[in-house]
């Protein structure tokens, strides 16, 4: 007859993933003639579980290098973009104990410029960006294991004897080099 035990342990009890594409408009001081480059830096975020979702609140800086004055001068304009991504969770565990949990948010795709263009009216810069997150909720859950009544504990002394024999075979002089003068 088998015997079962219930064990409470921590495990990933829910997961979610979200891919986002967004468009941001930047207003430079001077009217742009052409776009020379665009990049995103300084990405920071925090994650919090709210109900059956994880809310990721963060920001990043968009830098756009552009020319103006009929392509005779250049400048870099920077704008901080704030965002909130709400990730729906898929629960994998019906035995999840909702008292305490830990939220782990991982960036699968750092915010990245897809395309940087000049707006149709010619005085703004339009930046298309993308980002992707994976969110996991780690919480306490209950698992049931079968107890093996025939199990015997291994003798640790045998393992220690084998380790002692291996240590005896080591040459203690292998690290010693020629004495320095």
UniProtKB/Swiss-Prot annotation:
One of its GO terms (molecular function) is identical protein binding. The gene is cotE. Residues 102-144 are annotated as: Required for targeting to the spore. Morphogenic protein required for the assembly of the outer coat of the endospore. Is also a regulatory protein for the expression of cotA, cotB, cotC, cotH and other genes encoding spore outer coat proteins. It comes from Bacillus subtilis (strain 168). Homooligomer. Residues 58-75 are annotated as: Required for oligomerization. This is Spore coat protein E. Pfam families: CotE. Coiled coil: none annotated.
């Amino acid at each position: 007859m088998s015997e079962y035990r219930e064990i409470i342990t921590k495990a990933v009890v829910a997961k979610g993933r979200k891919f986002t594409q967004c468009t941001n408009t930047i207003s430079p001081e001077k009217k742009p003639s052409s776009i020379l480059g665009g990049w995103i830096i300084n990405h920071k975020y925090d994650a919090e579980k709210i109900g059956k979702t994880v809310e990721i609140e963060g920001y990043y800086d968009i830098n756009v290098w552009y020319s103006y004055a009929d392509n005779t001068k250049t400048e870099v304009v920077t704008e901080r973009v704030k965002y909130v991504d709400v990730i729906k969770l898929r629960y994998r565990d019906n035995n999840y104990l909702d008292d305490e949990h830990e939220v782990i948010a991982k960036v699968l795709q750092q915010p990245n410029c897809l395309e940087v263009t000049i707006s149709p009216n010619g005085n703004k810069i339009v930046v298309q960006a993308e980002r992707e997150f994976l969110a996991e909720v780690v919480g306490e859950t209950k698992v049931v294991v079968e107890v093996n009544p025939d199990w015997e504990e291994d003798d640790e002394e045998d393992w220690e004897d084998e380790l002692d024999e291996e240590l005896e075979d080591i040459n203690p002089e292998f690290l010693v080099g020629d004495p320095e003068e």
